[in-house]
Amino acid sequence: CHEFNLTPHFFNSEYSRSSIQGGYQLAKELFRKPLDCTAVFAATDSNALGILTAADEMGIDIPGHLSLIGFDNISATALSRIDLTTVDQPKRVMAVQAVDMLRDKIENGTQGYVHQILLPTLIQRGTCRKLDPSK
């Protein structure tokens, strides 16, 4: 955002639950006014799929007029008609580490919290366009 002199805005709505329908309703609310943003980063891929549907119905070209990124990398996002750019969490690593921590707690009576930082991966597909920093 800094490189392009953009300020992120957070959009909360009564429709912000993590579902396709929630994303659809949220987008219908967001798209009622003229777009003053270049991209939407949805909380989940399900929300992004709903946003994609609403944008299509309202004639908003993704990625031509609006870039869209989801979060989760669910399998449907790779379908050619969807082709959603998303963020993939290291789910398998998360599961293995959670089981290891639970086993350690059961076997050794370990107390407290463990702070882990796991790096996500950006999966670049077809719903984002490159911005020109000179504009």
Which residue ranges define each predicted feature?
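Bacterial carbohydrate/catabolite-sensing allosteric modules
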Residues: 1-135
